[in-house]
């Protein structure tokens, strides 16, 4: 919420954010297991050329014995593509920009038939005064990806950037027409 009627500095109303720090957040889980066609479509979309991900004959001759997904497939098997745990709480008058992710993989490959399950947690936030929009919140969320056997596949930390839209517009950064 922006209140500058009394020459006060604009503030983010974080009352619906603060109590969520460190807590698990909900989110959907995919119903269907990963299929070979899902892996093939993902590698085509990402333009991966390694035949271990799409060529049945080639993959059968490798140590895996079958097609395996590239590590990045974990994001495609997550509801919300990993950003969701960083985007919690209502901040009146704010806009959100996805700020990216960092990933760590643990050697468990995603195979056809696997079901990934995610545990999501709002890790925390910091507020920084920016030239762009004044008070701007950088929030982080963590997602742990496990397969149906409980094996750790990947961890991801996502960042969301939230700012007061009216303050950004006042400062000349209006993204409505972009």
Model-derived features with residue positions:
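HotDog/MaoC-like acyl-thioester-processing domains
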Residues: 1-18, 100, 105-178
């Amino acid at each position: 919420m922006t209140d500058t009627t009394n020459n006060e500095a604009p503030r983010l109303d974080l009352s619906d954010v603060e109590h969520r720090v460190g807590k698990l957040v909900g989110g959907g889980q995919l119903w269907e297991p990963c299929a070979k066609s899902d892996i093939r479509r993902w590698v085509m979309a990402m333009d991966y050329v390694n035949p271990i991900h799409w060529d049945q004959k080639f993959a059968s001759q490798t140590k895996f014995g079958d097609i395996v997904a590239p590590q990045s497939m974990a994001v495609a098997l997550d509801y919300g593509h990993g950003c969701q745990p960083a985007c919690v709480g209502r901040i009146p008058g704010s806009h959100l920009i996805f700020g990216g992710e960092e990933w760590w993989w643990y050697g468990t490959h995603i195979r056809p038939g696997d079901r990934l399950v995610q545990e999501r947690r709002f890790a925390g936030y910091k507020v920084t005064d920016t030239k762009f929009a004044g008070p701007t919140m950088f929030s982080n969320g963590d997602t742990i990806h496990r397969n149906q056997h409980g094996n750790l596949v990947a961890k991801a930390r996502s960042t969301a950037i939230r700012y007061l839209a009216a303050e950004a517009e006042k400062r000349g950064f209006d993204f409505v027409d972009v």
